[in-house]
Curated annotation (Swiss-Prot):
This is Adenylosuccinate synthetase. It catalyses: IMP + L-aspartate + GTP = N(6)-(1,2-dicarboxyethyl)-AMP + GDP + phosphate + 2 H(+). Mg(2+) binds at residues 14, 41. The keyword Secreted does not apply. It comes from Salmonella arizonae (strain ATCC BAA-731 / CDC346-86 / RSK2980). InterPro entries: Adenylosuccin_syn_GTP-bd, Adenylosuccin_syn_Lys_AS, Adenylosuccinate_synth_dom1, Adenylosuccinate_synth_dom2, Adenylosuccinate_synth_dom3, Adenylosuccinate_synthetase, P-loop_NTPase. Plays an important role in the de novo pathway of purine nucleotide biosynthesis. Catalyzes the first committed step in the biosynthesis of AMP from IMP. It comes from the Bacteria.
């Protein structure tokens, strides 16, 4: 039996993690975000009602679940308050269900200004960030000048620290990027207005998780973005600024690494990517348009159209290695309904003609890579909403089996629609 279960993306994000976390938290006592910020976009559909969460863990809709934002998350006070208000307007008592680590770095207005100024300065070489200040906030954390939630307990000292760090960043904004400075007093006033709300939710997360482990409570760790966007293991520099892999759980929450019991990798039945960066199986034809339209592939956070392509088992195998995956959840299988044939990338052909079955690390090394495909028959029958494996077409079952063979990991959950009920749980992670 696994008490501590990690749910993370195995591709470039947007795999459908939010729905699965929401589904599995029916048995959990706690749900923990351990990295990223409000650049995530987790969409839940419950009884036909759609909820998009960016910062608050997906377990917040569950009455008996406590949601926790761990120290690995960069926290925007304004984004958090906006999301809390939207949920409270729907009658969800967020403040009774949400806890924060005092070590969460804060994202403030100058981080957003820096993020956007840098992307503009990069021009054609822009990374494609969400423009929400995530990267600059992590930079401040590593440079040891960042402000954290815990700093808000001493408001006078916070004001002094804020002034010092803003002088540093405003100098850069004005003199290097040639944009307006960010107003110190406005930033201070905005944060002070909600400081007591934030500090009122602070808890020692590491100790809480250790006590939960000793009691045998079920805990879900919710990843954001995807493995191939990891700052170390992704397609650098076209990556996010945090560790999106299973290793980020320990550093981003304070859970001891030996206590992770099961790692569930969410894998979309095809591939998507938002923003710039390598994407060997990207499709520019009518099939790519079909996947985008049928899958409604537009970012929950930015609204940007996602790039689409065939499933890449080479990249997925890298995710298996890095995360020591216990099992997969296959999502959006129904999007492939109606295609005469489906393809899976099984290897890459390098510019010099070599065939390889592992991914490069640096983005430049991906240039000129050609995907080598295995083609399989598609299916005309609908898989949408199917809740039993026996109800799936034979061709769809063969597709599932081939993914398992190529990756060496069992598919324990199959999602056939956006609602939490449109799911087959073949093996429950908490029982594995």
């Amino acid at each position: 039996m696994g008490n501590n279960v990690v749910v993370l993306g195995t591709q470039w994000g947007d795999e459908g993690k939010g729905k699965i976390v929401d589904l599995l938290t029916e048995r959990a006592k706690y749900v923990v975000r351990y990295q990223g910020g409000h650049n995530a976009g987790h969409t839940l559909v419950i009884n036909g009602e759609k909820t998009v969460l960016h910062l608050i863990p997906s377990g917040i809709l569950r009455e008996n679940v406590i949601s926790i934002i761990g120290n690995g998350v960069v926290l925007s006070p304004s984004a958090l308050m906006k999301e809390m208000q939207e949920l409270e307007d729907r009658g969800i008592p967020v403040r009774e269900r949400l806890l924060l680590s005092e070590a969460c770095p804060l994202i403030l207005d100058y981080h957003v200004a820096l993020d956007n100024a840098r992307e503009k300065a990069r021009g054609a070489k822009a990374i494609g960030t969400t423009g929400r200040g995530i990267g600059p906030a992590y930079e401040d954390k590593v440079a040891r000048r960042g402000l954290r939630v815990g700093d808000l307990f001493d408001k006078a000292t916070f004001a002094e620290k804020l002034k010092e760090v803003m002088e540093y960043h405003n100098f850069q904004l004005v003199n290097f990027y040639k944009v307006d400075a960010v107003d110190y007093q406005k930033v201070l006033d905005d944060v002070m207005a909600i400081a007591d709300i934030l500090t009122g939710m602070v808890v020692d997360v590491s100790d809480l998780l250790d006590q939960a482990r000793k009691r045998g409570d079920f805990v879900m760790f919710e990843g954001a973005q995807g493995t191939l966007l990891d700052i170390d293991h992704g397609t650098y520099p076209y990556v996010t600024s945090s560790n999106t892999t299973a290793g980020g759980v320990a550093t981003g929450s304070g859970l001891g690494p030996r206590y992770v019991d099961y790692v569930l990798g969410i894998i979309k039945a095809y591939s998507t990517r938002v923003g710039a960066g390598p994407f060997p199986t990207e499709l520019f034809d009518e099939t790519g348009e079909f996947l985008c339209k049928q899958g409604n592939e537009y970012g929950a956070t930015t609204g940007r159209r996602r790039r689409t392509g065939w499933l890449d088992s080479v990249a997925i195998r890298r995710a298996v290695q890095i995360n020591s995956l216990s099992g997969f959840c296959l999502t959006k299988l129904d999007v492939l309904d109606g295609l005469k044939e489906v393809k899976i990338c099984v290897a890459y052909r390098m510019p010099d003609g070599r065939e390889v079955t592992t991914t490069p690390l640096a983005a430049d090394d991906w240039q000129g890579i050609e995907p080598i495909y295995e083609t399989m028959p598609g299916w005309s029958e609908s898989t949408f909403g199917v809740k039993d494996r026996s109800g799936l077409p034979a061709a769809a079952l063969n597709y599932i089996k081939r993914i398992e063979e190529l990756t060496g990991v069992p598919i324990d959950i199959i999602s056939t629609g956006p609602d939490r009920t449109e799911t087959m749980i073949l093996r429950d992670p908490f029982d594995a």
